């Protein structure tokens, strides 16, 4: 047995499923997960000492590359002053101010420790602000593992959802309406039937949890118009897309001003840090100013804030996003060309430093489209690349990520490996 196998067996004896987040278990693709020993730049090394070019990027946060020396130094300096205080720090103010400069929709902001906390609290805040209970989410969008958001579509077009996890009471989900992404007619019908009862609409503005799905321009326009008309709060869940698809997030690309925004991943630079923010009148409903309660012992942790501030500084440097976008487009175009040459049904898409790979004729517009893609083909591709030293997320439903550490030459090397894998798949 190799080290990965030994560690997985050992982990399963004490950690449920052997992992601390389900996708890491390789359940969707089969095989043994790689236990990572270290990471630097665009690479990770497993416990066997095998090096992989990494397109997981810690599921998005590693936008400047792993263990960036400036980020590490900022964290080291912060750690010398103490690890956690349970009291306010100047760094919390600075990072909130910097985010507000980048995202004009954020008039007030609060730090938390995870994306789940951010979305859970944003939903609670929207309900408290509006005095309404019902929420709209979209099938295939993931917003963390809080109870009201672990909901899948009901049996009818506009029936309320069913729990997507054991342990979530069915009665608890009666206020959550699950609609099809990019379906304007469903959205209009939902507001026509229940508009005065809807507290908020939450969505991933580019969906990263059914690979990469783009919203249509008409869809985001309808979202903004309908929520404004009916007094519902529009929540952009930018935990994944914030500072990843563009400096100003998806909202800057859409030209949309959401009422609330949730963010995470990149803003922590690889450390546990997230936030929610938006309109002043809504945000001032949160305690201690208002009656909507939220708290956290480690919210605004000084080490995480230091990592986040340095990451935000780096990504604001001239040419950062132009280069990141160009490298990501180079990758997906190379994959498309390689698959076409091998006669494999495949397409790919990207926005900023985020990309999606689909074993289908066309990029998906919603969850049903993604579910019809060739998942078995993805599994073969995933293992073919992994065996040759290229790591993608172990699920056909997860987006991939490029960092500033991925050079054009490294992208070319990855594409060359993909050429081999596509040829082998076609044989």
UniProtKB/Swiss-Prot annotation:
Subcellular compartments: Cytoplasm
Molecular function terms from GO: glutamate-1-semialdehyde 2,1-aminomutase activity; pyridoxal phosphate binding; transaminase activity
Subcellular location, principal: cytoplasm
Classification via CDD domains: OAT_like
Pfam families in UniProt: Aminotran_3
EC number annotated for this UniProt entry: 5.4.3.8
Modified residues (N6-(pyridoxal phosphate)lysine): 265
Catalytically driven reaction(s): (S)-4-amino-5-oxopentanoate = 5-aminolevulinate
Reported cofactor(s): pyridoxal 5'-phosphate
GO aspect biological process, one term: protoporphyrinogen IX biosynthetic process
GO CC annotations on file: cytoplasm
Pathway linked to the protein: Porphyrin-containing compound metabolism; protoporphyrin-IX biosynthesis; 5-aminolevulinate from L-glutamyl-tRNA(Glu): step 2/2
Domain of life: Bacteria
Keywords of the record: Cytoplasm, Isomerase, Porphyrin biosynthesis, Pyridoxal phosphate
InterPro entries from the UniProt entry: 4pyrrol_synth_GluAld_NH2Trfase, Aminotrans_3, Aminotrans_3_PPA_site, PyrdxlP-dep_Trfase, PyrdxlP-dep_Trfase_major, PyrdxlP-dep_Trfase_small
Family: Belongs to the class-III pyridoxal-phosphate-dependent aminotransferase family. HemL subfamily.
The protein's assembly and partners: Homodimer.
Name of the featured protein: Glutamate-1-semialdehyde 2,1-aminomutase
Protein's organism: Neisseria meningitidis serogroup C / serotype 2a (strain ATCC 700532 / DSM 15464 / FAM18)
Higher taxonomy: Bacteria, Pseudomonadati, Pseudomonadota, Betaproteobacteria, Neisseriales
């Amino acid at each position: 047995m190799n080290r990965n196998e030994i560690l997985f067996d050992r982990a399963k004896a004490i950690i449920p499923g052997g992992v601390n987040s389900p996708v890491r278990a390789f359940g969707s693709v089969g095989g043994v997960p790689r236990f990572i020993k270290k990471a630097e730049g665009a690479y990770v090394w497993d416990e066997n000492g095998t090096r992989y070019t990494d397109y997981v990027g810690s599921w998005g946060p590693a936008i400047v590359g792993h263990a960036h020396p400036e980020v590490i130094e900022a964290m080291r300096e912060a750690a010398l002053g103490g690890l956690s205080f349970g009291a306010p720090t100047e760094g919390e103010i600075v990072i909130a101010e910097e985010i507000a400069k980048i995202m004009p929709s954020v008039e007030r902001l609060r730090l938390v420790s995870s994306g789940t906390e951010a979305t859970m609290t944003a939903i609670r805040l929207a309900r408290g602000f509006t005095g309404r209970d019902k929420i709209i989410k979209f099938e295939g969008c993931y917003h963390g593992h809080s109870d009201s958001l672990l909901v899948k579509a009901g049996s009818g077009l506009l029936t309320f959802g069913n729990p997507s996890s054991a342990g979530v009471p069915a009665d608890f989900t009666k206020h959550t309406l699950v609609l099809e992404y990019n379906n304007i007619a469903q959205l209009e019908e939902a507001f026509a039937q229940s508009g005065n009862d809807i507290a908020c609409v939450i969505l991933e503005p580019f969906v990263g949890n059914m690979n990469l799905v783009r919203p249509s321009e008409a869809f985001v326009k309808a979202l903004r118009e309908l929520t404004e008309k009916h007094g519902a709060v529009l929540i952009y869940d930018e935990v994944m897309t914030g500072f990843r698809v563009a400096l100003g997030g998806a909202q800057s690309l859409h030209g949309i001003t959401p009422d609330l925004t949730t963010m995470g991943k990149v803003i922590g630079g690889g450390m546990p840090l997230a936030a929610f923010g938006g309109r002043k009148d809504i945000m001032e409903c949160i305690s201690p100013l208002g009656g909507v309660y939220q708290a956290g012992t480690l919210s605004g942790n000084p080490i995480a804030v230091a990592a986040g501030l340095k990451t935000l500084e780096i990504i604001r440097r001239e040419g950062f996003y132009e280069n990141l976008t160009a490298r990501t487009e180079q990758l997906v175009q190379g994959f498309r060309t390689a698959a076409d040459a091998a006669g494999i049904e495949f397409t790919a898409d990207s926005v900023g430093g985020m990309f999606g790979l689909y074993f289908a004729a066309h990029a998906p517009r919603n969850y049903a489209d993604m579910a019809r893609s060739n998942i078995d083909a993805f599994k073969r591709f995933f293992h073919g690349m992994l065996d040759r030293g290229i790591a993608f997320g172990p699920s056909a439903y997860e987006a991939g990520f490029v960092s500033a550490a991925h050079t054009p030459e490294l992208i070319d090397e990855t594409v060359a490996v993909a050429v081999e894998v596509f040829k082998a798949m076609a044989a």
